[in-house]
Amino acid sequence: MGRKHYSSKKNRSKKGEFVNWDLIERKNENFEKYYRLQKLVTEDDFILLKQKLTEQLPTTFRITASIPHATQVRDYFIEHYYPLIENARTEDAKIPLPVSLPWYPDGMAFMLDISKEVIRKSPHLKALQEFLVLETEAGDINRQESVSMVPPLLLNVESHHKVLDMCAAPGSKTAQLLEALHKPTKKEDITTLLPSGIVIANDSDNKRAHMLVHQIKRLNSPNVLIVNHDASFLPNFHLSSPDGKKFLKFDRILADVPCSGDGTFRKNIALWNEWSLKTALGLHATQIKILMRGLQLLEKGGRLVYSTCSLNPIENEAVVSAVLNATRGSVRLVDVSSELPQLKRSQGVDNWVVCDSDLNIYPSFDTLPKELYEKMPPTLWPLPKKELAELNIQNCLRIYPHFQNTGGFFVAVLEKYENLTSSMKTAVDDNKVFLREQKLPSEQASKKRKQDTQETSSDSKLAEVKPKGKNGGNRFHELDPFVYIKEDDQALEKIYKKFGIDEAIIKKNQFFVRNVNGVPTKAIYISNDLFRNVIENNRNRVKFVHGGLKIFVRQDFGSLSREIAEKNGTCVFRVQSDGANLASHFIAESCLFHTTLSDLFILLDHEAVTIDDFPEDSLFRKEYNHLDLGSTLLHVDLAKEESVIKKQVYIPLWKSVRICNVLLSNSEKRTLKLQIEGPQSSIHKHNT
């Protein structure tokens, strides 16, 4: 029997109805019956697996690998928060200390064997909760289920790679891909912050694609582009090159496909009531299409990771083997048993039972009733064991919840060593032909078969999306299109002059705005050359949602300062906090104002300051009257100060005739205080 828990907590079911998760019995007879038929694990393991699925999921997070102070955040968490947790208790018991995930690189991920609800509600853990919230907002940590961290790690992304995340929302894996793209090899520099590679993150659902923006913006990357398409029909990305137009092929692709999610019982409690084999059966063909499309878009020599949060072979090995069988001679499964060596895993299985949604068993497609043909394609059934062995199906990874206290997950790492040929078609396509033959007269069916055999899945004839906009306009009707600023634009000229930007480091053609005129009226974004190439060659074929990094923002003067500013031709654009760190690497030293921690505290504690707010011996007071009207970038070297986190801080500063202020949100101020003073920070505790 599944355990019952009782409280007033409520959540939504798939239908959007409120349900009390704690009143749901952790049991589903059909789920148990189906997986006993599969015999994926031994009976003893199945008992452990079933029990683990009824238990609460631990809280896990990882430290952002691309920040230069990542090891400091790790050590800071251990030093300051372990003692707080060690002395904390819930109503029932002592709270266990966090543990570092043994398989995650450099000890940068942690597991707390308590639920997020306990952390949120326990007064003893208030400091921990605020650390998790503030550091997540700052982009220094990412709260993510541990097994979800595995697929991006196995992609081995490097800074020059062209990366595609086919089904990206909610974005935790996309964030990992970006971290890898930006990860410094030695020290942070302009090539680390603005590398040559790109991450294109796609989601088919418009709302989820926009939710993805919030997750990704925390990382302040100019190298990410979010698009909104059905992953199985992703359009080709065109590029211009010296030798003419060409298609963008990706070095790394993540296909974390839609699935039944039956590895997520521990966090999705409503699934105990809702689980049905019908979901997996309905998704199988879509999963094959997405994987096949991913391989078409993959560069020769590139790596693709296919993953699901399902335990079901018909969503996992059946999908992978169908595509491998169709692409023999071009794609292979990679043996990653030596990668992440402390991650406990099982091999892919070579035998499974195929049932209909009522759990009636069908040994082969030939035994299937005619009325189930459309719902159950031949690819559901396992290939002969010899063929599966030739495909190295054992190289797939199965991660079971009872192995290391996680959710359930499946991962397959594929490598494309030759381009796909025109004859490579999946059995799903063949099944469609078969179905039509059952419905059409013989002559008509013969013609249709000939037509289908002429269709292609080859790299040379990838699926095209034809522009349909009127007069060459954007057929997606973007409200805020990506338009690059003309290099002779007056506002851009003023920005370059104001901040002493060296065009040898940052070219003028890297800046764009989000309006149809291409005129910088509000925000200015920055990107790399590849990003621009993608944007300008795909306006009518790709639906762009978000991308680049907001680097400059227009800041209008008040009435008292406006006249002086206009008379002096003062630049009205200032550095945006999102891009302050990147800007510090290409603006002139004269545009940086170096100050002390004591001065910084005064600026953080006030909405606005005057010269009289600083003591007589203050460095800021001495230099105050020499500061230019408008924007300056404030710099504090915390490595030389009494600060918990020793890092370089760059903050936009705005000065008018009467006052001066730092342009940070309240949460940004609180996070900075927390990093300087630790959990005892007064601003952290009192939420000013």
UniProtKB/Swiss-Prot annotation:
PANTHER family given in the database record: MULTISITE-SPECIFIC TRNA:(CYTOSINE-C(5))-METHYLTRANSFERASE TRM4A, NCL1 YEAST -RELATED NOL1/NOP2/FMU SUN DOMAIN-CONTAINING
Region feature Disordered, mapped onto this chain: 439-474
Key word tRNA-binding present: yes
Catalytic residues in the record: C309 (nucleophile)
Lineage per the UniProt record: Eukaryota, Fungi, Dikarya, Ascomycota, Taphrinomycotina
SUPFAM superfamilies assigned: S-adenosyl-L-methionine-dependent methyltransferases (SSF53335)
Keyword line: Cytoplasm, Methyltransferase, Nucleus, Phosphoprotein, RNA-binding, S-adenosyl-L-methionine, Transferase, tRNA processing, tRNA-binding
Coiled coil: none
Source organism of the structure: Schizosaccharomyces pombe (strain 972 / ATCC 24843)
Protein name in UniProt: Multisite-specific tRNA:(cytosine-C(5))-methyltransferase trm4a
Stored InterPro entries: MeTrfase_RsmB-F_NOP2_cat, MeTrfase_RsmB-F_NOP2_dom, RCMT, RCMT_NCL1, RsmB/NOL1/NOP2-like_CS, SAM-dependent_MTases_sf
Annotated transmembrane regions: none
Residues modified as Phosphothreonine: T54
UniProt catalytic activity: cytidine(48) in tRNA precursor + S-adenosyl-L-methionine = 5-methylcytidine(48) in tRNA precursor + S-adenosyl-L-homocysteine + H(+); cytidine(34) in tRNA precursor + S-adenosyl-L-methionine = 5-methylcytidine(34) in tRNA precursor + S-adenosyl-L-homocysteine + H(+); cytidine(60) in tRNA(Asp) + S-adenosyl-L-methionine = 5-methylcytidine(60) in tRNA(Asp) + S-adenosyl-L-homocysteine + H(+); cytidine(61) in tRNA(Asp) + S-adenosyl-L-methionine = 5-methylcytidine(61) in tRNA(Asp) + S-adenosyl-L-homocysteine + H(+)
The gene coding this protein: trm4a
